[in-house]
Regions:
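Single conserved hydrophobic/aromatic residue that forms the stacking wall/gate
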Residues: 1-14, 18
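Phosphate/diphosphate-binding loops
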Residues: 139-154, 162-164
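Low-complexity, glycine/alanine/valine/leucine- and proline-rich hydrophobic stretches
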Residues: 165, 317-331
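Conserved, well-ordered active-site substructure
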Residues: 283-317
Length: 382
């Protein structure tokens, strides 16, 4: 029954006017939730209540979606275009969803908002003047540490919005709030939030690389940096307002992600730079649009595994490993075509050790004074 149901869902005629980042409250997102035995009626009730509040004609400060969208758009225009999502531990992955929504919707025409998810939280002095923090606080979670960190950010003058969630079902309300807010922010930035003009580029490059592989029997070999050279390259390109995007083509593991957190922490501490992280090829449909179409402030560190052991793809003349490397190379070439600085490092036999080697070599940067700005007041969810 489950197999039949899944097949029927897959065969559904999805509405072509719904962006992939807006599917969470459609059948695409709700059916998996139902299979997990979540209360769908309760989810939709929370989302519907938020929709009513966002659709009513009222002052911006009383409209949850318009308020967040106006804050994101106005602060981005003022130079605070790095929206850093903080969330209670049980809902920490919300930031990954918001990452795709914001990056895919706003990153175009050399404008956009850079979403930051699951970055280690540090002292306020470590952050530059390009940050805007949004804190999703879940009632009943262990929030003591995060509460203190957020309060420190507010005292230091960083703009912070806090949304209070009664329980996890309030995430449905947040989904609608953020979708509405993203459209508002896109309007303020003067871009069309419902298209993805640069997503296809990397796909086309990947196909060209694979065609070359099937003809020549090998993939092109881009210039590869050692961990030491990677750090030199990164350090030489970091400027005020930059962000470092770490793009990893490797098997996801907890140990590897812990190493990535150490690297992100080192970069923020030493260079006061924003960091993002994504696994390839997943990020191509998340932050990939922003990387190529958004502001030219990104510095890209591409980490590529040896892809062993490997598996052959049925009915194809290449393996999954070759496909992944072709996707990495295709995106690298697309980034370079847009004038983006890209540094590639081969992870080698021990990906964790390679990432740690980069983190240990991150150079300190001269300290600079932190600029204080006006605070953004707390906005509850209900």
């Amino acid at each position: 029954f489950k197999q039949k149901t899944a097949y029927e869902i897959y065969q559904c005629d999805w509405s072509s006017d719904v962006c992939s980042s807006d599917l969470v409250l459609s059948l695409f997102g709700l059916v998996p939730a139902a299979l997990l035995r979540l209360d769908i009626s309760r989810l939709l009730q929370r989302a519907g209540a938020m929709a009513v509040r966002c659709r009513e004609r009222r002052a911006i400060q009383d409209n949850p979606g318009a308020y967040l969208g106006t804050a994101m758009g106005a602060l981005a225009q003022a130079g605070r275009d790095k929206v850093t999502v903080l969330a209670s531990s049980p809902i920490d992955t919300f930031g990954l969803w918001a990452e795709q929504l914001l990056a895919e919707s706003t990153g175009k025409e050399t404008r956009g908002i850079v979403p930051v998810a699951q970055e280690p939280v540090l002292s306020p002095a470590q952050y530059g003047s390009d940050r805007f923090f949004v804190y999703l606080r879940l009632k009943g979670a262990n929030n003591q540490t995060l509460d203190r960190q957020v309060q420190a950010l507010v005292r230091a003058g960083h703009p912070v919005l806090t949304f209070a969630l009664r329980d996890r079902y309030d995430l449905a309300a947040e989904f609608f709030r953020w979708e509405y807010a993203t459209a508002v922010a896109g309007h303020l930035l003067g871009i069309q939030p419902f298209d993805q003009p640069n997503v296809q580029e990397s796909k086309d490059n990947t196909r060209r690389v694979l065609d070359g592989y099937q003809t020549a029997g090998r993939l092109p070999e881009p210039v590869v940096s050692s961990p030491k050279d990677a750090v030199v390259g990164l350090s030489g390109k970091v400027q005020v307002g930059s962000y470092v995007a770490i793009l990893a083509y490797t098997t996801p593991t907890k140990l590897f992600e812990a190493a990535i957190r150490r690297l992100r922490k080192a970069l923020v501490q030493q260079h006061h730079v924003t960091t993002t992280f994504g696994y390839g090829p997943r990020y191509l449909h998340s932050t990939g649009q922003l990387h190529k179409g958004g502001p030219a402030s990104g510095i890209f560190l591409e980490l590529v595994d040896r892809m062993t052991p490997d598996l052959t793809i049925p009915a194809q003349q290449f393996s999954f490993g070759v496909l992944a490397k072709a996707q990495a190379t295709g995106d690298l070439e697309s980034l370079q075509a847009h004038g983006r600085p890209v540094i590639r490092v081969t992870l080698g036999a021990d990906p964790v050790a390679t990432v740690d080697a980069i983190a240990h070599r991150v150079r300190p940067a001269p300290s600079r004074p932190h600029r204080r700005t006006a605070r953004v007041r707390r906005r509850p969810n209900s």
